């Protein structure tokens, strides 16, 4: 009887009218045929939105209906299949309703007492070769990166089973979901099985397959309670296992285009548990061609008072992998080039954080040297301790003048804009500079740097076989005037051995210096420099100076210089340039002493 043309026409009219009435819009169906086992096949379906734009088109749809309900003038759909469907959805702005909202509103029961002619309970949905387009028309478009405000999904295929769907339970199985998105996303297959009620939810499995990615999640379970029809978040607990899987980063270039060159896979597995406000990572393992990570950690109070801790059992990075990451991600994530010069990296330690505070403590081993680190970062402040048995500073800085560096240092400081302030204290056991190894240097100072200007206030001590230096004081060029207050004691100082000068070979110097000067430049400097017990020892020479005092000032607006020393005294008053002062004095003396004049002229001629 169902194949009688009059009956088919009646069924078609009932179905079309029921859909139009339920959705409240124009619905077109080109042809309706009956299939096997109560199936109705609809060809050429078009559903319009309320602006009379095509919302959904499908070359063919197959639905399974309840014949008994149909004979009573109702349409009850238990399963559906869509072939070649295209959904064109959009909204004008983020605050306007989408053009499909009326469909959702029509399916929602606003008047429970009113009986609908259409009962849609789709237990099985199959989609083949579908397309989904969505645009938020006021939002800018992007190319090559996923944009949830502009979606263009093609090759959409799905097989979804809704075994149970009631007010208090759900039994859902996605046997397969595959799609492509214009951003470059390719989902080969997603399968999952989920059961849920008002007390617990169980995720039997979730499998995701992409061209080079295979993710396997299992044994997910969550327990919770409802109060006044609302989920009581404090009652939520959950756990989940990510079985051994692998990820090819370039598969996720639709999220971060910089991942496109990363074609080698990374093996990953983890196990987590938690509550509505906490997360515990029982284990996390990552393994790739240039990286290995074994770690665990916790997070809690992430809603308003985030705290986290992590323990890194092993972090290993190969040099070629680091170089590859810097080449492809360096600019986006501001990775310094110095990282690439460390070579292979191995780290073991702990990290924890609270709000903007981050702390790191552990042992770092690299091809450029090893170090023990303890670092705290708080907003724009930092505090840390470093112990190193030897770091190739020249290799890291790419500066041939530097070599190895061995030290124990504490630092406390801040940065704000282009200003850096540091208080440093510690011992530098050795420091290679200009092909010489300095030993036994201690530092206790406060340093502030802004662009090319700097303040220094503190102590510097060096007890090296070729020089003993004790420096205490301050200097600054950050104000309008250069200012320096320094006291220095120097003993057995050998410039040649330190690779600083070769003018006086094998000479050793000693002296005491007390300086207090300020000025815009050398010619306007005011203050004094005192040198005591200056001593020079050389194989064939010995020179000693008890004292030398140089004072610069002004008298009635005129610059004055006063020099007092063992070998004589000098007073200068007037305008002069330090760069030419020595030659000027020599020429004055030469005019009074002819022999000196001849010697000076001969010297200038030789030059």
Placement of each model-derived feature along the sequence:
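Short extracytoplasmic
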Residues: 21-44
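Transmembrane beta-strand segments that form the barrel wall of outer-membrane beta-barrel proteins
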Residues: 174-177, 201-207, 278-286, 355-365, ...
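Residues on the solvent-exposed faces and adjacent turns
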Residues: 44, 65-67, 84, 91, ...
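Gram-negative outer-membrane beta-barrel proteins
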Residues: 88-90, 133-135, 178-180, 246-250, ...
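N-terminal type II signal-anchor transmembrane helix
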Residues: 1-23, 86
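Secondary-structure transition motifs
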Residues: 23-25, 44-169, 174-179, 185-189, ...
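Amphipathic hydrophobic-ligand
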Residues: 51-65, 139-157, 182-193, 199, ...
């Amino acid at each position: 009887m169902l194949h009688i043309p009059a009956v088919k026409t009646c069924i078609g009219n009932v179905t079309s009218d029921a859909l139009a009435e339920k959705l409240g819009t124009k619905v077109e169906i080109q042809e309706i045929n009956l299939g096997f086992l109560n199936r109705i096949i609809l060809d050429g379906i078009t559903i319009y939105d309320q602006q009379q734009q095509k919302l959904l088109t499908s070359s063919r749809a197959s639905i399974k209906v309840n014949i008994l309900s149909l004979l009573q003038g109702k349409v009850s759909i238990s399963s559906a299949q869509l072939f070649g469907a295209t959904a064109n959805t959009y909204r004008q702005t983020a605050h306007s309703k989408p053009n499909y909202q009326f469909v959702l509103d029509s399916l929602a029961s606003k008047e429970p007492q009113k009986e609908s002619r259409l009962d849609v309970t789709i237990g099985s949905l199959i989609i083949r070769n579908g397309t989904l387009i969505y645009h938020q028309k006021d939002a800018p478009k992007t190319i090559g990166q996923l944009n949830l405000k502009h979606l263009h999904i093609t090759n959409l295929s799905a097989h979804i089973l809704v075994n149970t769907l009631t007010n208090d339970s759900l039994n859902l199985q996605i046997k397969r979901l595959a799609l492509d998105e214009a951003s470059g996303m390719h989902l080969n297959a997603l399968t999952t099985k989920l059961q849920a009620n008002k007390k617990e939810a169980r995720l039997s499995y979730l499998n995701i397959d992409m061209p080079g990615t295979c993710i396997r999640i299992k044994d997910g379970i969550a327990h919770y309670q409802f109060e006044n029809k609302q989920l009581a978040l404090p009652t939520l607990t959950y756990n989940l296992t990510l079985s051994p899987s692998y990820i090819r980063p370039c598969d996720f270039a639709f999220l971060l285009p910089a991942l496109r060159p990363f074609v080698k896979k990374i093996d990953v597995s983890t196990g987590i548990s938690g509550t509505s406000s906490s997360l515990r990572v029982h284990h996390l393992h990552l393994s790739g061609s240039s990286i290995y990570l074994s770690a665990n950690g916790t997070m809690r109070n992430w809603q308003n008072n985030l705290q986290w801790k992590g323990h890194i059992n092993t972090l290993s990075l190969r040099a070629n992998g680091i170089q590859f990451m810097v080449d492809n991600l360096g600019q986006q994530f501001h990775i310094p080039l110095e990282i690439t010069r460390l070579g292979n990296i191995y780290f073991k330690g702990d990290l924890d954080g609270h709000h903007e505070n981050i702390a790191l403590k552990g042992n770092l081993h690299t091809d450029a040297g090893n170090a023990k680190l303890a670092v705290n970062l708080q907003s724009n402040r930092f505090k840390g301790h470093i112990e190193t048995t030897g770091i190739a500073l020249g290799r890291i800085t790419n500066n041939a003048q530097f070599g190895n560096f061995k030290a124990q240092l504490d630092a406390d400081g801040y940065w704000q804009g282009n200003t850096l302030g540091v208080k440093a204290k510690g011992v530098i056991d050795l420091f290679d500079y200009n092909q010489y190894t300095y030993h036994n240097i201690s530092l206790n100072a406060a340093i502030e740097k802004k662009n090319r200007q700097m303040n220094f206030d503190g102590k510097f001590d060096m007890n090296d076989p070729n020089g003993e230096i004790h420096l205490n004081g301050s200097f600054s060029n950050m104000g309008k005037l250069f200012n320096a207050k320094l006291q220095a004691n120097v003993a057995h100082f050998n410039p040649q051995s330190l690779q600083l000068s070769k003018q006086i070979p094998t000479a050793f110097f000693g002296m005491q210096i007390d300086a207090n000067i300020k000025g815009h430049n050398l010619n306007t400097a005011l203050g004094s420099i005192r040198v005591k017990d200056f001593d020079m020892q050389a194989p064939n020479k010995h020179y000693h100076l008890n004292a030398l005092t140089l004072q610069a000032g002004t008298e009635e607006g005129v610059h004055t210089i006063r020099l007092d020393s063992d070998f004589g005294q000098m007073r200068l008053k007037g305008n002069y340039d330090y760069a030419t002062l020595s030659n000027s004095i020599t020429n004055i003396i030469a005019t009074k002493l002819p022999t000196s004049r001849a010697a000076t002229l001969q010297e200038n001629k030789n030059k």
